[in-house]
Amino acid sequence: MNKIYFVIVFVACFCLFAEAQLTFTSSWGGGKRSGVAPMSCKNEEAVATIFKLIQNEAERFIICQQKS
C-alpha cells in the first residue's frame, strides 16, 4: 500500500517538474546574471596544498608499513 502512495507522489512531483520545463522560455532576454565568481586561491596554491596532502599520506603509509 505504501508503495502505491510513493509511486503516486513521485509521479505527481515529476508532472510538476515537467510542467515547469514546458512553461520555460529562452526569449526573456538577458536579465540579471552574475558573472563567474573569482577563485579564492591561486592554482599554484591549490597544487601545493594537494601535493602536501599526498606527501603526508605517503609518510603515514610508510610509517604503517614499518610497524607491520
From Swiss-Prot:
Entry-linked InterPro entries: Adipokinetic_hormone_CS (IPR002047), AKH/RPCH_hormone (IPR010475)
Pfam families associated with the record: Adipokin_hormo (PF06377)
This protein's UniProt keywords: Amidation, Cleavage on pair of basic residues, Hormone, Neuropeptide, Pyrrolidone carboxylic acid, Secreted, Signal
Ion transport is among the record's keywords: no
Annotated signal sequence range: 1-20
Modified sites of kind Pyrrolidone carboxylic acid: 21
Organism: Agrotis ipsilon (Black cutworm moth)
Disulphide connectivity of cysteines: none
Locations listed in the record: Secreted
Tissues of expression: Expressed in antennal lobe (AL), corpora cardiaca (CC), corpora allata (CA) and gnathal ganglion (GNG) (at protein level). Expression in CC and CA detected in all animals, expression in GNG in some animals and in AL in few animals (at protein level).
Keyword RNA-binding found: no
Family per record: Belongs to the AKH/HRTH/RPCH family.
Protein name: Adipokinetic prohormone type 1
Residues with Glycine amide modification: 30
Sample GO molecular function, one term: hormone activity
Record-level GO cellular component terms: extracellular region
Function as written in the Swiss-Prot or TrEMBL entry: This hormone, released from cells in the corpora cardiaca, causes release of diglycerides from the fat body and stimulation of muscles to use these diglycerides as an energy source during energy-demanding processes.
GO biological process, one term: neuropeptide signaling pathway
Taxonomy of the source species: Eukaryota, Metazoa, Ecdysozoa, Arthropoda, Hexapoda
Domain of life: Eukaryota
Cross-referenced PROSITE patterns: AKH
Residues of the propeptide: 34-68
